[in-house]
């Protein structure tokens, strides 16, 4: 940075070329130098003559003339007298706009504290003087004395307690001390003067050194904190004239006494206007009233002092003056707010700048613009993609100046006046000129709410009659517009540059892709989809079936001649190939570009297929082809939707015949369950869950039957079915409400009402059903209103935190990346690997797991083709560069960001990626919330999980798994954690019998098998091996990773598999709960039908070591008996196309070397008919089982006290149920006394049902008790939006889980004050101790091994803990998967990179742990950039750098902590931000978007970066 010079802002012109902006405290001299005179009188204007009073608040002499170039008395009245001061009235003759910039001042008789520096925490004045804020207020408001000079004064007679400097005394103490010590120099005063003097006499440098010594010498943390607080304020004052550590010559640092006001500046009068209303009344700005009070009190005080009034009166007046100034600056901050005539608080200067209606947000960030208008929109189906219909009336107004010029230029009018008259009379020449003006001049359309960049797009206007704007149907999705009365605003770009940007960047035909996901946004919807779908349907036995047509012309002729039905199946020739298709599909083909393959159009075209088609055309053909294609598609869709004549009739809604039967069956089941409950066989929770499950499955069966019926009706041409099936409108769920049953409904709190609505809308609902329905529907509407506000607020916070992220460089040179894999939740894939790596840059080479060759090297940009190759090659995790690991000094670099999804190319420097990310996340947030009630409040939850099923083939491996066998001989899981069941295939087999050895090198792991005279070594990459914490399910994914089943030194047999690839994994307890029943044994083969997946020749191989040996003796019908059989499908060049592992017990379906011509053929069949279930468990309860055999002892379990008895009437069996609410200190438990005195204790939850009696003998794995799982609640985005908000705000969740910080073995120590004490012992001898509240459920057992990051108790994991314990990359994985789960659950696609940008901003500050020789203070939060710069500076001088740890800030905190003052102030907590900035003399280098918008400059992104280079645009005529 060059040396800055402060620029004085003069009224004649504001400086255009300033580089930075600094906020400072103004000294009294400075305030006086701004002022044009002192305001002495509280008068405003003379109410008779309406002229401002002299020396009053609107005085023309001080502030300038009221009318341009006219003095007040009217002596000088023309431009020629400019600059003359009138002798009579003293007014300078100049323009009246100086009244917006000239300030006055009021000389206060006594210094007054500025309320911001007293009352805004931490109180700056109080902190500097070391006085509490309350005490300081007492001094300032004349209630207490402050010691100026303690002399030798003591509080007590024994002289033990000395009076210190700046002590605060009450009246009594003061009088007492004055009596005794006045002679020894004791002095104390009260009020503003003494505070000002104290501040003026502070020696800041000495204070700074003193405080630094104090810090070094104190050990108390609390004291340190207070000293550090003071130190910060002192440092801020001392450094307030530094800029990046270089002095600014002409500037003195801020002085503490400037926080006291002696000269009060008066705001220029036009900024606090007084407007005459009709009827002789005046609207006056509140600030004027507040100033009047200050002036009144000040003059009164002056008079009283001249009269030598009694001290007490003067004091009172001074206090009132202080209060008046307080009210002016921040009304209501201290005592009660000053109220105006109409009983509402007056708006002070602080209120004027803060809040939504304040100066920042209302006038600086959002301005009204001219050349704009708004009107209702209607559909314009005849428009081209880049056109909009503009009403002639609007165009006439919008283009008026252009039109006037054009009329003169053509010679129709000679003067402007004449031209205006022509326009008013709307003569023919006017319309002719208007057409010419509008041609080639784009306009911008905007629909509020503007949620993302596609809410403002440019169009070429087409003049239309009428008053409504016409909009192209395909851009509605981007604007989220419909035609039920929506309005849109039109803006006219004026400058050549703006017009060029509209044409090149903003034209709607250029914005085909959605920046959030890279999918196309201009996809046909509703009618258009219906038309295209109808066109592509096929009908058996239609007229003209099996005709042969050479091309589209013949088809059209046949259709015209009515000799061919549009749905008839015909044969035709396309690209020289004979194909079977339908007439309608050939019509679709006729509008497609030539490069579209047959499989994209020769099928039934539903909405998804059309979207894929549009995407494909854009990717292959580019913008121009897409735009014209989309227009043809639109026309075709509308034409055939009309010709199809699809309508809805009640007869289309078909109710299944067997509905009543199904319902009666369900009612019967419900009655049975109700009876079991009455008999006490099941708990109330189980009853509720089971009933809901019954109704859910009944509903599903009915819906399925109904869909089948409607599908068969009219051979698939049922109108309602077509609408839903094509994706035009409606869904299966909605049709089933019309025709099957309305189903289960939810209460407003989300719980499901157990009586479903059995009727459907066709039959009609009865009164009760109708009432239950309204319940859900109203909740939907109420929610919508509330949530829109929340979503909008979230968007605003995201924008504010990310607005300064832009692409600054091409490559930051970072080599580290983040390893990513597919995101799954409970075994459901939420986001595939392919989607996640698309458009990203690799951070490490990708190695083909089969051939060990490098597929793609580091630095490759992954496009769709490469992403497909990577996923097909079986790679399960990829390391990519992300904004979080980007090393760019500011912003991000192109390589770490990847593709700009809006255009599908690598992002260019200057792109405002932060704003785009914030919009991409915020926009669907609003969308989601606006759409809760579409399912009409019907409940949607998944059926309870009861089992896990293998989806792939291989064999079973138990990892760390222990099991029990129960009395029925079932295998029961005995682990609570740190165990898993893996499904694997062999990767390396032992070539001979020997001992296995495993050595860990830096990046490799060497596995060797040693026999007497033989040794085989295999080298694996460490990165490919599954880590222990991944196997235990703590972090990351294990599929595709390698697993070594043996430990070092174990003997293995020949051909035993020693390294395996994990195909699927189910960890305990996340995927398989404790006490589940296992249905497989260790080593069991799992077979599935194996599908070829490619055409080619089959070759069978056997794994030997790590290579494949050819085996030729396998033939059709053989059963595989050995581990390690692989089949390879070789293409015509004898290259491997596909490879599959064939597990034991599979049946081979082809001979060796046979040719497979169908990629869907089954090569090997599963030996089992049904699917393979790995484990099963009780879906409704958590089971407690006996771990040892022994005798039962009850503890704190008493019937009628902590438990209740339930009696089964049929069997007379009694069982105890623990009460829901227990007395304090009562902790029911079951103890088992085993052999050898071993005791095991089971803590019981409320509502647990006990299955054993006190004193019973039990066997291992017997069931002791069951706790019902919580009653199911309906899923709704309500959980979604607050969840997203909670994650972005990094809030600590209410019930945070306690998390292990180290790997180790759990030990329970003796409890401490009703808290459980858990100690984790690590292998290296270190340990960590946790005290856990009794209210939390502990999830670990004594002696268990636990990994860092695992939960010790129940609850939600806090993202702060993830960052602290597992680091930034784990946080990246956690936040992205949590946020994506919410959005994908709603079917919203957002690219990961947008979330990453926000997360990187949440991590942009670090916390200083050790300050070294830097200027930082321990515990400071500083931005990474400042931290880096300061450390570089210190290292240059050979000093000790500071050490810091990453912290996660919520988006609000991160936005307020922005390095830019203006940006932070305009976000939230305006007064606080400005207070801090003014004391520290903070600089704002105007690097980012928001501050430049506020100052009205070009914003430094995109085309704004080139503004310095003065590019001029030439117009070609």
UniProtKB/Swiss-Prot annotation:
The record, for Pfam families, names: RNA_pol_Rpb1_1 (PF04997), RNA_pol_Rpb1_2 (PF00623), RNA_pol_Rpb1_3 (PF04983), RNA_pol_Rpb1_4 (PF05000), RNA_pol_Rpb1_5 (PF04998)
Quaternary organization: The RNAP catalytic core consists of 2 alpha, 1 beta, 1 beta' and 1 omega subunit. When a sigma factor is associated with the core the holoenzyme is formed, which can initiate transcription.
Q: Which family does it belong to?
A: Belongs to the RNA polymerase beta' chain family.
Q: Which residues bind Zn(2+) 2?
A: 812, 886, 893, 896
- List ligand-binding residues for Zn(2+) 1: 71, 73, 86, 89
From the UniProt record, list the reaction(s) this protein catalyses: RNA(n) + a ribonucleoside 5'-triphosphate = RNA(n+1) + diphosphate
**What Gene Ontology terms describe where this protein resides (cellular component)?**
DNA-directed RNA polymerase complex
Which enzyme class, named as a word? transferase
Q: Give the UniProt record's GO annotations in the biological process aspect.
A: DNA-templated transcription
Q: Which GO terms describe its molecular function?
A: DNA binding; DNA-directed RNA polymerase activity; magnesium ion binding; zinc ion binding
Q: Which gene encodes it?
A: rpoC
Cofactor binding notes: Binds 1 Mg(2+) ion per subunit. Binds 2 Zn(2+) ions per subunit.
Q: Which Gene3D superfamilies match?
A: 1.10.132.30, 1.10.150.390, 1.10.1790.20, 1.10.40.90, 2.40.40.20, 2.40.50.100, RNA polymerase II, clamp domain (4.10.860.120), RNA polymerase Rpb1, domain 3 (1.10.274.100)
Listed PANTHER family: DNA-DIRECTED RNA POLYMERASE (PTHR19376), DNA-DIRECTED RNA POLYMERASE SUBUNIT BETA (PTHR19376:SF54)
Q: What is this protein called?
A: DNA-directed RNA polymerase subunit beta'
Q: InterPro entries from the entry? A: DNA-dir_RpoC_beta_prime (IPR045867), DNA-dir_RpoC_beta_prime_bact (IPR012754), RNA_pol_asu (IPR000722), RNA_pol_N (IPR006592), RNA_pol_Rpb1_1 (IPR007080), RNA_pol_Rpb1_3 (IPR007066), RNA_pol_Rpb1_3_sf (IPR042102), RNA_pol_Rpb1_4 (IPR007083)
Q: Where does Mg(2+) bind?
A: 482, 484, 486
Which NCBIfam families does the record match to this protein? rpoC_TIGR
Function according to Swiss-Prot or TrEMBL = DNA-dependent RNA polymerase catalyzes the transcription of DNA into RNA using the four ribonucleoside triphosphates as substrates.
User: Which cofactor is recorded for it?
Assistant: Mg(2+); Zn(2+)
Sorted alphabetically, which keywords does the UniProt record give? DNA-directed RNA polymerase, Magnesium, Metal-binding, Nucleotidyltransferase, Transcription, Transferase, Zinc
Question: EC number(s) on record?
Answer: 2.7.7.6
